[in-house]
A protein has these predicted regions:
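Alpha/beta-hydrolase active-site loop
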Residues: 149-173
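N-terminal cap/lid segment of alpha/beta-hydrolase-fold proteins
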Residues: 55-94
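Cap/lid segment of the alpha/beta-hydrolase catalytic domain
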Residues: 134-157, 265-270
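N-terminal secretory signal peptides
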Residues: 1-29
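Short beta-strand element of the alpha/beta-hydrolase
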Residues: 97-106
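Short beta-strand/loop motif that positions the catalytic acidic residue
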Residues: 227-229
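Primarily recognizes the serine-hydrolase "nucleophile elbow" in alpha/beta-hydrolase
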Residues: 165-222
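N-terminal export signals
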Residues: 18, 27-52
Length: 295
C-alpha cells in the first residue's frame, strides 16, 4: 500500500470497492464513480492503487516456512469440476493425527492471502486444505480481477461440490483424525454456511462475512458454528438477525460476533479494509473454536 492514510478515505470509497469486488460495478463504472473522491491531491490511479491488494508485502507465513509441510495436491471432485488443485499444509513436527480445516477463498480463486491463511491454520496445529475453485479453468490467474471474472464463469452448484469433495478428501487423509471443519471468507463464508447445511458430519463451520443459507435449511445444520460479521458490511450483516433467530429457534450451537466500525474483508491483511484488532481477535476465536471442536 502507498502513503494514503486509511482514515482520510471516506466510507463511500470502501463501499464502491465492495461493489466492484463483488461484480456489481464493472471497472469503468467503478473508476467513474471513484473520480468523485479524487480531491485534495488524490488521483483516481492513486486511489485504485491504495484499494488493490498488496500480496508481496503482507504474507505472514511464507510458502517455504521450515515449520511446515506445505504442497499443492490434486483431488477428485466427480460431481463438480473433476480434478481440483489445493494447497495442503500441516506442521512438520506433528505427533499423531490432526484435526482438519478446509479454507475457502473469496470470489477470486486461491490467491496468496488464502494460501497464507491455510498455512496459518497449519501453524496453529491443524492439517489444512485450501482448494482452488478455478482449477477447471486453469487455476488462479495471478491477479484478483481476472480471478473474479473466471470465478463468475463457473457453475455455483459444481463449485459447492468441489468443496464438499475437499471435505471428503481431508477427512480420509492419513494425517487427519477424521474431524474436519471449514473456515471461509466472503464467497467462502457462504460456502461454509452451505457445508454446515449439506455435510452432516462436518465438525465445525466458521463463516467470515458470508451469505446466510435459506432459513428453511437451518434445521439441517448439525455442526457448531462461529460466525464473524462486520458492522459496516450492511449488505451481508443485514441477514444476520434473521439467521440468528432461526439458529436459536432450532436449538443450534453457535457463537456470533459483529465487529464494530470495520468493513467486509476486515480479516484480509493485504487490503486497506483490513482491521488488525478485529482480525486478530476473530482469528484467535476461530483457532480456539477449532481446537475445541476438532479434537
Amino acid at each position: 500500500m502507498n502513503q494514503i492514510d486509511k482514515k482520510d478515505i471516506k466510507q463511500e470509497v470502501f463501499d464502491l470497492y465492495d461493489d466492484y469486488a463483488h461484480n456489481r460495478l464493472n471497472r469503468r463504472s467503478f473508476m467513474q464513480k471513484l473520480s468523485a473522491y479524487a480531491v485534495g491531491g488524490l488521483t483516481v490511479p492513486a486511489l485504485m492503487s491504495f484499494l488493490m491488494p498488496d500480496y508481496e508485502g503482507n504474507i505472514q507465513v511464507k510458502a517455504d516456512d521450515p515449520r511446515l509441510k506445505s504442497a499443492y495436491i490434486n483431488y477428485s471432485s466427480a460431481k463438480g469440476g473433476g480434478t481440483i488443485k489445493g494447497l495442503l499444509s500441516q506442521p512438520k513436527d506433528a505427533k499423531g493425527k490432526l484435526g482438519g480445516i478446509i479454507v475457502v477463498h473469496e470470489n477470486r480463486g486461491l490467491n496468496p492471502y488464502i494460501e497464507d491463511v491455510g498455512r496459518r491454520a497449519a501453524l496453529a496445529g491443524f492439517i489444512s486444505l485450501a482448494p482452488d475453485a478455478l482449477s477447471p479453468l486453469g487455476g488462479y490467474p495471478g491477479n484478483d480481477e481476472a480471478g473474479r471474472e473466471l470465478q463468475s464463469k463457473r457453475d455455483k452448484g459444481q463449485m459447492e461440490e468441489d468443496f464438499i469433495a475437499a471435505f471428503e478428501y481431508l477427512k480420509n487423509h492419513k494425517d487427519c483424525n477424521g474431524k474436519v471443519g471449514v473456515v471461509g471468507f466472503c464467497f467462502g463464508g457462504g460456502i461454509a454456511n452451505m457445508m454446515a447445511v449439506r455435510v452432516p458430519d462436518l465438525a465445525a463451520a466458521v463463516p467470515f462475512y458470508g451469505s446466510q443459507p435459506a432459513l428453511t435449511d437451518v434445521p439441517k445444520i448439525k455442526a457448531p458454528l462461529m460466525l464473524h460479521y462486520a458492522s459496516l458490511d450492511t449488505r451481508i450483516t443485514a441477514g444476520w438477525p434473521a439467521y440468528e433467530a432461526a439458529l436459536k429457534e432450532n436449538g443450534k450451537k453457535y457463537q456470533g460476533f459483529v465487529y464494530e466500525n470495520v468493513n467486509h474483508g476486515f480479516h484480509n491483511d493485504t487490503t486497506p479494509r483490513y482491521d488488525k484488532t478485529a482480525a486478530d481477535l476473530a482469528w484467535k476465536r476461530t483457532v480456539d473454536f477449532f481446537g475445541e471442536q476438532l479434537k
